[in-house]
Amino acid sequence: MKKIAALLLAVLMLTGCSADSSKTSEPLTPDKVFSGGTPDIDIEGYQRPSSMLSMSAQQIVMNMRIGWNLGYSLESCFSNVIGDYIPDVTPNDWQTIDETFWGNPAVSEKLFWRLTDSGINAVRLPITWREHIDESGNIDEDWLNRVQQVVDYAYNCGMYVIITVYHDGANDNDAWIRNAVKDYRSTLSIYTNLWSQIADKFRTYNERLLFESMNEVEFVGSGGDRGYEILNGFNQAFVDTVRSNGGNNGYRHLVIAGYAADITKTCDPRFKMPEDIDNHCILSVHYYTPKTFCRASIQNYWGNKSEQEWMEHQINNLRTTFIDNGIPVIITEYGAKGSDEASRVFFCEMLTKLCRDNYISTFLWDDGSEFDRTSFTWHPPELINALKRATSGNSYVPEKPENIDEQTREAKPTSETSEPDNEPAESEPTEEHTTTEETADIPPETFQSLTG
């Protein structure tokens, strides 16, 4: 029986998931999104691989009604980046780096039950591994067990859960994934070893557990084409490593990191989705535009005509580049920091409604300021109600706060930014990259699948 299952998987993998975002296909329609219905979910834990195989990635995405990020918790780490919303601290004892290191309380099961009660049914767990692995990528057992415990908190509430690799790929000096620019092979070895252990730990979990390859990684200094080649190679290695682990990982739905999580850069034809079995890969990008409103309280109001039009333009870009070509999309992070509460709520509702209408799920970034993890209350209270409206399926236009046009400048946002912890570099040159000694290790390789 195992040989038959392996043979089936090998045949499916040869067909490819969606290797190129530029391929054409018939535009998506609602009946295609939901064709086949929604399979029953086994909240007790294990689900047969055949059930996971029958449920498409787009169905998974649409089942995620309201998503939420457990920010500033499991991704806590030492950082020497000044500002940019990463606490700049130097611990006296490296062992003190745990989920409370950036000021939030230890994660409890009660937190996820309260989130569920409020309407959240999907959670993304940003996890930084670099403080808990050795030089080969072997994970500290206690840390991996704690990660599993937190996963179980959410999973046992019936939530969808996304596990990701977080500040291991950020732009500070300890973000080891960026070393792939100089040492591709060794960095890839650490990366695949890390994911092999994570995959093995969670191999029996059903379709409500998803893995995300990495968070907002761009390879600064790699030079245009080379940066895309490196990311594409790592994403392919991620897929192949998980698939080769066996168990439910042969069919697990996987979330693929876009280039720097930036919509414009990811819609670039140089970005490629990895080869995989059909309908089991999902694209991940972020939306933090404009940065003066989303990342800092420099701009306190949002919602004039040009700002709304830019949001619509970017979501349409995702729709035509990926969704209409059979590639599901999740905006795994979005949020706002402007001081005007009405503007923040309007921004979140507008984005969520627009995405939902285009078959995209969204995950609110929360560093502890949106949902208080002690009192278990939303700030402002209207935020969660707005998200419920936006994901209700009802046809309506979110109501813009009064006087927004007078409070905001009628100017097109100049650039797209990343999640609130790191600002990505400017778009790299489009001209062909000339290889140097620093970047000429080896070309990214596509691993041969071991599953068949």
What are these regions (language model features)?
Residues M1, D20-Y46, P401-G452:
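Intrinsically disordered, low-complexity repeat and linker tracts
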Residues T15-G16:
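C-terminal motif of bacterial Sec signal peptides marking the signal peptidase cleavage site
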Residues K2-A10:
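Sec-dependent signal peptide recognition
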Residues D42-E44, R185-Q299, Q314-K337, D357-I360:
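Active-site region of glycoside hydrolase catalytic domains
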Residues F101-A122, I133, G137-H167, A175-L210, ...:
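An active-site-proximal structural segment forming one wall of the substrate-binding cleft
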Residues E26-A122:
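N-terminal carbohydrate-binding accessory modules
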Residues M311-A386:
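Substrate-binding cleft of secreted/luminal carbohydrate-active enzymes
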